């Protein structure tokens, strides 16, 4: 088990008295043992302490530490080349996913309508895939939302709220390319006149900045079937 790092308070407590203990002294107090360094010809005397710590050098990524406890191998990441188009793996009442898309927009009017449109489009166009799509969530800054009428002088505007809005789509890695392409299509096919964004100077512009970020999980993510849009024909 890896021990936590020593806090600055405990390390610096001896300043002005016994002095700051060395890293080797701290490791020795934890029970670490050290071999006496043997500087052979051609080996620099500045060899790092890790080279002389018993059990610190790993002979092979597939072998345990010499003289130390065995460690379980790190679980490999999901393969991005899986081609099965069936429903995702199920674990009882849960459905397993490994890829997440985040669709976000900032300071945009009509953003809820846009994310609702994306959700409906994915439900219809990707009906043969099992996916999960969250409802719209919003985050705002510390700027005040409500102001008294006449609180701002004429010619000035209220501070920006910096409100952002996100939605999340989960799917299998094998279906990520289809989901990514469908997100691009539905975002680009929107009617620009229906959506507006607030620029930094306060003016409204007929455009919607929409950002799509993709994440891959090294471990399966499980959602209950009641929260998943199951593939057509899936039980």
From Swiss-Prot:
PTM details?
Phosphorylated.
Gene Ontology CC terms: host cell nucleus
Superkingdom is Viruses
Question: Which InterPro entries does the record match to this protein?
Answer: Herpes_UL3
**Keyword NAD among record annotations:** no
Q: Where, subcellularly, is it found?
A: Host nucleus
Where composition is biased (Polar residues), the residues are: 38-50
Please give the residue ranges the record annotates as the region Disordered.
Answer: 38-89, 138-157
Q: What UniProt keywords apply to this chain's record, in alphabetical order? A: Host nucleus, Phosphoprotein
* Protein name per UniProt: Nuclear phosphoprotein UL3
Task: Please give the organism.
Answer: Human herpesvirus 1 (strain 17) (HHV-1)
């Amino acid at each position: 088990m890896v021990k936590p790092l020593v806090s600055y308070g405990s390390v610096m407590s001896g300043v002005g008295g016994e002095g700051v203990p060395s890293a080797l002294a701290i490791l020795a107090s934890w029970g670490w043992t050290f071999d006496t360094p043997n500087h052979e010809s051609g080996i620099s005397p500045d060899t790092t302490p890790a080279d002389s710590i018993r059990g610190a050098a790993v002979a092979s990524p597939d072998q345990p530490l010499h003289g130390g406890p065995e460690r379980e191998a790190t679980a490999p990441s999901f393969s991005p080349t899986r081609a099965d188009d069936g429903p995702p793996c199920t674990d009882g009442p849960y459905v397993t996913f490994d890829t997440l898309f985040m669709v976000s927009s900032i300071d945009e009017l009509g953003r809820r309508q846009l994310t609702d449109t994306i959700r409906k489009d994915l439900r219809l166009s990707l009906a043969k895939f099992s996916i999960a799509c969250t409802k719209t969530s919003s985050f705002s800054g510390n700027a005040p939302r409500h102001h008294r009428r006449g609180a701002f002088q004429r010619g000035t505007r209220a501070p920006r709220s910096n409100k952002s809005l996100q939605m999340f789509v989960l799917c299998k890695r094998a279906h990520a390319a289809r989901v990514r392409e469908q997100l691009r299509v539905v975002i680009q096919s929107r009617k620009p006149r229906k959506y507006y964004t607030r620029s930094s100077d306060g003016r409204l512009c007929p455009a919607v900045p929409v950002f799509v970020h993709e994440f891959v999980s090294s471990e399966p993510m499980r959602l209950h079937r009641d929260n998943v849009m199951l593939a057509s024909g899936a039980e």
